[in-house]
């Protein structure tokens, strides 16, 4: 199991947990809108570090953004497997072709 798969499994396991017991459970208990807001904040922080050129800070913020992306998706019952399947369906297709087919 990859670290991303392990993270997704942990997030899934926290869906029904007591919000007082974990940050993930607390965030999920606040609903998809709050999860989306938090993902947006983390994505902006990653963008800032990318612009600044700080590789270590970007790596850290990218990890935070990936975590919050998975939490946001879990809040809407979209799993990492769903995302992987979507990526697999696009594999081998030009990005321009894929975009035109949407």
Curated annotation (Swiss-Prot):
EC number of the protein: 3.6.1.31
GO molecular function: ATP binding; phosphoribosyl-ATP diphosphatase activity
Pfam families to which the protein is assigned, alphabetical: PRA-PH
Catalytic activity: 1-(5-phospho-beta-D-ribosyl)-ATP + H2O = 1-(5-phospho-beta-D-ribosyl)-5'-AMP + diphosphate + H(+)
Keyword Acyltransferase: no
CDD domains: NTP-PPase_HisIE_like (cd11534)
Any one GO cellular component localisation term in the record: cytoplasm
Keyword Manganese: no
Signal peptide (residue range): none
Annotated localization: Cytoplasm
Principal subcellular localization: cytoplasm
InterPro entries listed in its UniProt record: HisE, PRib-ATP_PPHydrolase-like
This protein's UniProt keywords: Amino-acid biosynthesis, ATP-binding, Cytoplasm, Histidine biosynthesis, Hydrolase, Nucleotide-binding
Segments forming a coiled coil: none
Single GO BP term: L-histidine biosynthetic process
Matches recorded under Gene3D superfamilies: MazG-like
This protein's pathway: Amino-acid biosynthesis; L-histidine biosynthesis; L-histidine from 5-phospho-alpha-D-ribose 1-diphosphate: step 2/9
UniProt superkingdom: Bacteria
Similarity remark: Belongs to the PRA-PH family.
Record's protein name: Phosphoribosyl-ATP pyrophosphatase
């Amino acid at each position: 199991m990859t670290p991303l798969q392990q993270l997704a499994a942990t997030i899934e396991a926290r869906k029904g947990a007591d919000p007082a017991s974990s940050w993930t459970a607390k965030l999920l208990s606040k609903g998809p809108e709050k999860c989306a807001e938090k993902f947006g904040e983390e994505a902006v922080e990653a963008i800032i570090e990318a612009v600044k050129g700080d590789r270590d800070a970007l790596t850290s913020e990218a990890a935070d953004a990936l975590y919050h992306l998975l939490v946001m998706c879990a809040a809407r019952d979209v799993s990492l497997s769903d995302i992987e399947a979507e990526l697999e369906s696009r594999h081998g297709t030009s990005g321009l072709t894929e975009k035109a087919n949407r």
